[in-house]
Structures are given as structure tokens and as C-alpha cells.
Curated annotation (Swiss-Prot):
This is Dihydroorotate dehydrogenase B (NAD(+)), catalytic subunit. FMN binds at residues 21, 45-46, 99, 127, 165, 191, 217, 243-244, 265-266. It comes from Bacillus cereus (strain B4264). Binds 1 FMN per subunit. Its EC number is 1.3.1.14. Its main location: cytoplasm. InterPro entries: Aldolase_TIM, DHO_dehydrogenase, DHOD_1B, Dihydroorotate_DH_1, Dihydroorotate_DH_1_2, Dihydroorotate_DH_cat, Dihydroorotate_DH_CS, Dihydroorotate_DH_I. Pfam families: DHO_dh (PF01180). Its cofactor is FMN. It catalyses: (S)-dihydroorotate + NAD(+) = orotate + NADH + H(+).
Length: 309
């Protein structure tokens, strides 16, 4: 028995560890360090219909417990991803999750329709929560009706299950999650980065050229845990949890909150081996905690509460 096997819509994962979109590129750099086939899946970098060069520099800044980024969805565009990046990834035993982005609804639909045809793309991640672009991105993810409409339109053209990436920069994330579920989403990924800023002590001006950026890393983990905990009790579709994961213990905490798999982001920049290390350490941690299979951890924090009432 594979104690780490996870079954999700469109995704049969040998383990629940997935490098997060935007922190792993298309895997080429990390393939120099280890065989990517050990991973559960890869969420590839956000893909738009046309190439994007991203925001002006500087667009990354360190913060205590994390980092700010304002990359701006830099990517080579749909044609290059379809004809170069995805074919290259076929050498690995991996179901790919393609992250889809755009400036308007029609862009999302066009990219989703084409990229979902790729033989190794088993699911889409609808990026409606990027805080670092002026159009699209987070504009779609802060309004339940708009988020639901976009989800429905993408579902109509996609040949694979659709997961929607939620923004934490909202007043009521549960309301948005439920609207997206009603619109037909197959799953959720959460959370994207928190909007933040740093100022230069000498100039008193923002360090990032974009002024603001997305905060990621361990600093946001408690927020992510709280939101996964809330949303998982309100919806009946699976959640891929993310936000500050660095260790096997972090993974179990997300599972306890209600996640069915996890994505590791910023930690990949610090330690390129973080994902295989977590995968290697999980079985011993399950033994220590008394679990036969990782699925036994899912939702344990609130399911225990329900059973005790």
C-alpha cells in the first residue's frame, strides 16, 4: 500500500506534494537536482495567451519570515508552453496542473481550451487571485459572481477538471469558495499571496517598482491554515492547500485543516530539495502520529469536533 497516494478529480497522485505555480517555473532548473517523477504533480507557471515580460524591477524583496514578489505573470505564452515546455515534461511520470491566467474572461477561456488538450495536462488551476497585475488576476477573485461566471465559462471548454486558486485578500473567502463550487469547479487551491509592501529606509519609497507585492513564505501559514479550515467545512470539493509549507509537519497541519493535497512554493527558492525531502519524511511522521495513510489526517481538526458534539 502506498501510504501517500491521493486521488483527486483528474489527478492520481503518488503523494500529495506539488510544487506551487510560480515557484518552480516549468521544472527545468529543478530537474538538474532530482528526478521530478518523485513528485505528486507540478503546477506549472501561469500561462497567458500571449507572452508576458512581467513587471519592472526590482520585483522581489525579502521580509522577515517570507518574501514579497511582484513578478507580474511573466511567461513565454501559450504557443511556447504547448510546443516546448509541456512536451519536455512528458519524460516524467507526472500529471501536470496547468495554471491559466489572463486579462479578461476571453483570455482565460482561450488558454484553457487549448492547454487542456495537452496529453500530460490532467487539470487546470484557474488563477483568479494574482495581486500583481493591473488587469485580470485578483479582479476576478474578489467578487463571488464574477468568480463563478469565469469558472463556469472555463468549465464549458476545458477537457480536464478545473481547480480555482483563491485569494486571501477578500472579506469573505467562504462566500467566494461556495460560489465557485456552485459554478462547477472540481476543486480549490488556496491560498495565493497576501498583498504587502516594504519601504526603503533612505528614500521612504516602496522597494518594489510595482509598489506592492504578494507576501509568501512561513509568515502567511497561519492565515492559510485558518482559511483552509473554514472553507473545507463549507464546500464538498477537494482543496489543495498552500502557504508557507516547509516541512512534513506543515503538510500534516494543512491536512488536519482540511486539505487533500498541498503545494510548496517559496521554500523551493531556499532549498531546491525541499519537496523530495518532505516526501521522504512523511511516512515516519505518519508512524509517529499513529496513522496508516495520509488520508486519515484530512479534516481531522474539525471532524473530531463534530464527532465530539
Amino acid at each position: 500500500m502506498n501510504r501517500l497516494q491521493v486521488e483527486l478529480p483528474g489527478l492520481s497522485l503518488k503523494n500529495p506534494i506539488i510544487p506551487a505555480s510560480g515557484c518552480f517555473g516549468f521544472g527545468r532548473e529543478y530537474a538538474q537536482f532530482y528526478d521530478l517523477s518523485v513528485l505528486g504533480s507540478i503546477m506549472i507557471k501561469a500561462t497567458t495567451e500571449q507572452p508576458r515580460y512581467g513587471n519592472p524591477t526590482p520585483r522581489v524583496a525579502e521580509t522577515p519570515g517570507g518574501m514579497l514578489n511582484a513578478i507580474g505573470l511573466q511567461n513565454p505564452g501559450l504557443d511556447k508552453v504547448m510546443n516546448s515546455e509541456l512536451p519536455w515534461l512528458e519524460q516524467f511520470d507526472l500529471p501536470i496542473i496547468a495554471n491559466v491566467a489572463g486579462s479578461q474572461a476571453e483570455d482565460y477561456v482561450a488558454v484553457a481550451k487549448e492547454i487542456s488538450k495537452a496529453p500530460n495536462v490532467h487539470a487546470l488551476e484557474l488563477n483568479i487571485s494574482c495581486p500583481n497585475v493591473k488587469t485580470g488576476g485578483i479582479a476576478f477573485g474578489t467578487n463571488p459572481e464574477i468568480a463563478a461566471d469565469l469558472t463556469k465559462r472555463v468549465k464549458e471548454v476545458s477537457e480536464v477538471p478545473v481547480y480555482v486558486k483563491l485569494s486571501p485578500n477578500v472579506a469573505n473567502i467562504v462566500e467566494i469558495a461556495k460560489a465557485i463550487e456552485t459554478a462547477g469547479a472540481d476543486g480549490l487551491t488556496m491560498i495565493n499571496t497576501l498583498l504587502g509592501m516594504r519601504l526603503d529606509l533612505k528614500t521612504a519609497k516602496p522597494i518594489l517598482a510595482n509598489r506592492t507585492g504578494g507576501l509568501s513564505g512561513p509568515a502567511i501559514k497561519p492565515v492559510a491554515i485558518r482559511m483552509v479550515h473554514e472553507v473545507s467545512q463549507a464546500v464538498n470539493i477537494p482543496i489543495i492547500g498552500m502557504g508557507g509549507i516547509e516541512t512534513a509537519e506543515d503538510v500534516i497541519e494543512f491536512f488536519y485543516a482540511g486539505a487533500s493535497a498541498v503545494a510548496v512554493g517559496t521554500a523551493n527558492f531556499i532549498d531546491p530539495f525541499v519537496c523530495p525531502t518532505i516526501i521522504e519524511e512523511l511516512p515516519a511522521l505518519l508512524d509517529e502520529l499513529g496513522f496508516d495513510h495520509i488520508s486519515e489526517c484530512q479534516g481531522r481538526s474539525w471532524k473530531q469536533t463534530c464527532h465530539s458534539r
